[in-house]
From Swiss-Prot:
One of its GO terms (cellular component) is cytosol. It is an enzyme of class 1 (oxidoreductase). It catalyses: (2R)-2,3-dihydroxy-3-methylbutanoate + NADP(+) = (2S)-2-acetolactate + NADPH + H(+); (2R,3R)-2,3-dihydroxy-3-methylpentanoate + NADP(+) = (S)-2-ethyl-2-hydroxy-3-oxobutanoate + NADPH + H(+). The gene is ilvC. It comes from Streptococcus mutans serotype c (strain ATCC 700610 / UA159). This is Ketol-acid reductoisomerase (NADP(+)).
Length: 340
């Protein structure tokens, strides 16, 4: 079902005016939301545990508190800590300091949708989910536009939750480029599916498989890297700018013919069935349970996955080749880190 895109002219609310806003967490999304809202004229404080993020928030000029104290002081509390620690932060520091009429916000529906956080019935619960990482939310705001966002309301005892969500999205710059209404269920399940089946899980394993096929057939690993990984950005940029049509128009007839002939052989019906199974695991809560259980055990599976991935030949080859390509390594890695 199609939904209508909203823009700044459609957001005729001032629900954040006169309110004290606490951004909980000062990592990838936290720093962007906080700085954009402050630059939009809103009263923002930071709630975060003592450590690197606490120091960084103070350095950036914010009044910074422990999470519980920030929750007490604020009218609107936006939880932007990593998914896996939100439930503990909420139970230990946020919940004891919530009171009727306050609003609780999220940028991803994971903990609310799967029931790891259960807000009191007299507290508004809303979501504003930018469709991009925090450094882009901040950078595009400073450049005069923004990143599109989804917004949703989970519960609305005050009758003002939707206005808060819309004004928040406007304050971080998203209304400049477009807002789409959703639900916590829809955002959570679609976001997880996109990450797992296409954007990360699907893409990285497709690249890895292509690299292995070429190198196992005797082709030079350096050439294989360029063919299946390095050129990926060039293709994705074209798709990003103008869809499949622009990408195909920008490539040779040989490449386009091969796309149509071989693509369905590689990504056949069985892949779609596997995707459906992955979606079912997300919808049932199976993936969420596995993720939370792994976190609670100290992330043994995630750490093992990371160690295995670090040993891949394509990663070693890529690290060497990128040393000779400074143009692909100019970003500040610190902008991509997520601090708890």
């Amino acid at each position: 079902m199609a939904v209508e895109m909203l823009y700044e002219a459609d957001v005729k609310v001032a629900a954040l005016d006169g309110k004290k806003i606490a951004v909980i967490g000062y990592g990838s999304q936290g720093h962007a939301h906080a700085q954009n809202l402050r630059d939009s004229g809103h009263d923002v404080i930071i709630g975060v545990r003592h450590g690197k993020s606490f120091d960084k928030a103070k350095e950036d000029g914010f009044d910074t508190y422990e999470v519980g104290e920030a929750t007490k002081l604020a009218d609107i509390i936006m939880v932007l800590a990593p998914d896996e620690i939100q439930k503990d932060i909420y139970k230990d520091e946020i919940a004891p300091n919530l009171s009727a009429g306050k609003a609780l916000g999220f940028a991803h529906g994971f903990n609310i949708h799967f029931g790891y956080i259960k807000a009191p019935e007299d507290v508004d619960v809303f979501m504003v989910a930018p469709k991009g990482p925090g450094h882009l939310v901040r950078r595009t705001y400073t450049e005069g536009f923004g990143v599109p966002s989804l917004y949703a309301v989970y519960q609305n005892p005050t009758g003002n939750a939707e206005n808060i969500a819309l004004d928040w999205a406007k304050g971080i710059g998203s209304a400049r480029v477009g807002l789409l209404v959703t639900t916590f269920k829809e955002e959570t399940e679609e976001d997880l599916f996109g990450e797992q089946a296409v954007l990360m899980g699907g893409l990285t394993h497709l690249i890895e498989a292509g690299f292995e096929v070429l190198t196992e057939a005797g082709y030079a690993p350096q050439l294989a890297y360029f063919e299946v990984l390095h050129e990926m950005k060039l293709i994705v940029d074209l798709i990003y700018e103008g869809g499949f049509k622009k990408m195909r128009q920008s490539c040779s007839n040989t490449a386009e013919f091969g796309d149509f002939v071989t693509g369905p052989r590689v990504i056949g019906p069985e892949v779609k069935e596997n995707m459906k199974a992955a979606l079912a695991d997300i919808q049932s809560g199976k993936f969420a349970r596995e993720f939370v259980e792994d976190h609670d055990a100290g992330f043994p599976r995630l750490k093992a996955f990371r160690k295995e991935a670090e040993g891949l030949e394509i990663e070693k080859i890529g690290a060497e080749l990128r040393k000779a390509m400074p143009f692909v390594n100019q970003n500040d890695d610190d902008a991509f880190k997520i601090y708890n």
